Amino acid sequence: MNNTIINSLIGGDDSIKRSNVFAVDSQIPTLYMPQYISLSGVMTNDGPDNQAIASFEIRDQYITALNHLVLSLELPEVKGMGRFGYVPYVGYKCINHVSISSCNGVIWEIEGEELYNNCINNTIALKHSGYSSELNDISIGLTPNDTIKEPSTVYVYIKTPFDVEDTFSSLKLSDSKITVTVTFNPVSDIVIRDSSFDFETFNKEFVYVPELSFIGYMVKNVQIKPSFIEKPRRVIGQINQPTATVTEVHAATSLSVYTKPYYGNTDNKFISYPGYSQDEKDYIDAYVSRLLDDLVIVSDGPPTGYPESAEIVEVPEDGIVSIQDADVYVKIDNVPDNMSVYLHTNLLMFGTRKNSFIYNISKKFSAITGTYSDATKRTIFAHISHSINIIDTSIPVSLWTSQRNVYNGDNRSAESKAKDLFINDPFIKGIDFKNKTDIISRLEVRFGNDVLYSENGPISRIYNELLTKSNNGTRTLTFNFTPKIFFRPTTITANVSRGKDKLSVRVVYSTMDVNHPIYYVQKQLVVVCNDLYKVSYDQGVSITKIMGDNN
């Protein structure tokens, strides 16, 4: 060894008491044995709007504790005609609500979307929940007997506070019967389809077939002690209102804020969807691909099959077509002598006043080149220059034809419109498919009448992404960084006498152009507060809401 290294050790002070960093004293743990346990549930249709509910009862004298719940769901074979695919992470999006109860009431519960949010940084959990090209890509059936999707099973990890530190945090049964209840979303929320797919029959025949698995622990001479858990509580604000309030807040560990689009029953049809590939570029490429067949047409005469309001012009020899204040260059090779190239100049357009600004999708293309195939009667596009963005891809079809639009907005062909897709994904956030557009310009949180926090930038979102290693567009105020399980979580504590028992959130939405159709997508503010509870095992399993620092 180097002399400097040797001397630095020899010269050390031996009189100082030092901790051993090369060995530890091993301790003999509680005697226990874990096992993977699976059970079937009892299905009912007692949920809101006749939603399916699965109940799983866990009562075994040899199961002392449990955690790490996994829900298995069978997806059936899909046959028929039309376009069809499952939404990404379909297993999570099947779930509306999960609760764990004992004879003393609900121990813990969570909304399906918050469960998904909690697992969004777990790539393995997301993969097993139904994220694959086989499930998520849009497949096509051409005859009634065509198989569109093969049967499959997805596995949904139900992340709970009882998983945080394995055995330490596990839910102890204390000789109690534990019931896990899962409420499912409507089938329309988990599929993407076009109008030719027979969804009515599929919906009638679709049956949720769940199985619950968990790790059960048999423990010898268990010594159960009280513990703390956080339980999320979600409040959804009124449509287009910038405020939402959570009441009866006594001890909260965090507060999260995000927005959701509200499409309603008629606004959930879109022009395109990329399927399994979910990057922003994939959304844009899928959208552009759908538009091109209507935008550039090779025909032996003026194109047919379009509405009378469509403005389709023949491309001149120099390839330059002027659309209002923009020029589009079009060059298609190998066009037969008896045919011409046409450009659709008002494919999709929107405006709130005549003779004012017009939002015209055709103008967003600046150069289009390709080659016409006489064998397939189609154009193979080689280079497309455009400014289409994720917001464009996220505009519901209904907004192009809404009463707010003073123009005939949707001038696509009937053939193209028939390929539009119904998308009712329940977990979409923001106003675009990727939640890229930050529509909150200012956030203020009040605890009672006092301002707890305010920001004019997305700092709380940036910190949430850094701390959770996920990018879901949620703004979060965290009041607890205390190591879990071994310490009582730190909370913001109420003072009821001073009116400090509610958290009020107010946002200022970002300014948007009223001539852009996305401006009219309705939105809702969502606030999620994590309340602190104490779990006791004196007489079965029960929880008590923490009301202050002294609990």
Swiss-Prot record:
The organism that produces this protein has a lineage beginning with: Viruses, Varidnaviria, Bamfordvirae, Nucleocytoviricota, Pokkesviricetes
Consequence when changing D25N: Confers 60% resistance to rifampicin
Q: What is the effect of changing R234I?
A: Confers 50% resistance to rifampicin
| Regulation: induction | Expressed in the early phase of the viral replicative cycle.
Report TM segments. Answer: none
The record lists the effect of D175Y as: Confers 50% resistance to rifampicin
Q: How does it assemble?
A: Homotrimer. Self-assembles to form a layer. Interacts with OPG158 (via N-terminus); this interaction is necessary for OPG125 association with membranes.
Q: Where, per UniProt, does this protein localize?
A: Membrane
Where's it mainly located?
membrane
List the membrane topology term(s).
Peripheral membrane protein
Q: What is this protein called?
A: Scaffold protein OPG125
